[in-house]
């Protein structure tokens, strides 16, 4: 199983926010991410779950 990993820039485009907003959310531990070397990476499935939680969307059955 491969994980679909996104860069900070890709997450910013996906969420339609400035990349600095992504860095701020990560530094405040409000957005799930991990580092590969010096670069932040985001797992798409984790990001989608986080987004649904932020929007209070109930999970699909």
Write out the residue ranges for each language-model feature.
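Polyanion-binding surface elements
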Residues: 1-21
């Amino acid at each position: 199983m491969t994980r679909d990993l996104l860069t900070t820039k890709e997450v910013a485009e996906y969420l339609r926010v400035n990349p600095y907003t992504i860095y701020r959310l990560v530094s405040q531990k409000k957005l799930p991410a991990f580092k590969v070397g010096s670069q932040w990476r985001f797992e798409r499935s984790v990001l989608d779950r986080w987004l649904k939680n932020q929007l209070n969307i109930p999970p699909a059955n």
